[in-house]
From Swiss-Prot:
This is 6,7-dimethyl-8-ribityllumazine synthase. One of its GO terms (biological process) is riboflavin biosynthetic process. Catalyzes the formation of 6,7-dimethyl-8-ribityllumazine by condensation of 5-amino-6-(D-ribitylamino)uracil with 3,4-dihydroxy-2-butanone 4-phosphate. This is the penultimate step in the biosynthesis of riboflavin. InterPro entries: LS (IPR034964), LS/RS (IPR002180), LS/RS_sf (IPR036467). Gene3D superfamilies: Lumazine/riboflavin synthase (3.40.50.960). It comes from Nitrosomonas europaea (strain ATCC 19718 / CIP 103999 / KCTC 2705 / NBRC 14298). 5-amino-6-(D-ribitylamino)uracil binds at residues 28, 62-64, 86-88, 119. GO terms for cellular component: cytosol; riboflavin synthase complex. Its EC number is 2.5.1.78.
Length: 164
């Protein structure tokens, strides 16, 4: 932490040591999902999360991700959760429904259980766009999960040490 003109600033913290991360991955558009997963887990371990502290579960599609995240959140075992998948535009309105409802579900679970959830569900016009974005987005979700887990832990510590 640093002080700037008498304002306490909480620095970002990308140290994954000691964190437990849950990942829910959609099996729909599996090649893209696995690309996201590979980049995500590589970045998690590079930042210090132990493989034994990463739990992966898979679900049929993006709409099922929030339910699995909710069950992981209920376990109170995880410091942060990650959602991975790809919703690729088709010729029907279904794309918008899946993209919007999966994102809404992630946000609802995060708020209800007070747990950070990194959204790695790609929404693209075609498979080429998804393939082009999967490596960067996979790594980004790992960094978001670690940074937000550490922020929540820091804020919890500050709350506990505050005078009552």
């Amino acid at each position: 932490m640093s002080y700037y003109d008498n304002i306490l600033e909480i620095d970002s913290n990308l140290d994954g040591n000691g964190l437990c991360i849950g990942i829910v991955m959609s099996r729909f558009n599996i090649d893209v999902s696995e690309g996201l997963l590979g980049a995500c887990t590589a970045e998690l371990t590079r930042l210090g999360v132990q493989e034994a502290d990463i739990v992966l579960t898979t679900v049929p599609g993006a709409l099922e991700i929030p339910v699995a995240l909710q069950k992981l959140a209920e376990s109170d075992r995880f410091d942060a959760l990650i959602a991975l998948g790809a919703v690729i535009r088709g010729e029907t309105y279904h794309f918008e429904v899946v993209a919007n409802e999966s994102a809404r579900g992630l946000a609802a679970v995060g708020r209800e259980y007070n747990i950070p959830i990194a959204n790695g569900i790609l929404t693209t016009d075609d498979e080429d766009q998804a393939t082009a974005r999967m490596a960067e987005k996979g790594g980004e979700t790992a960094r978001v999960a670690i940074e937000m887990a550490n922020l929540v832990l820091t804020l919890d510590e500050m709350d506990q040490s505050a005078p009552t």
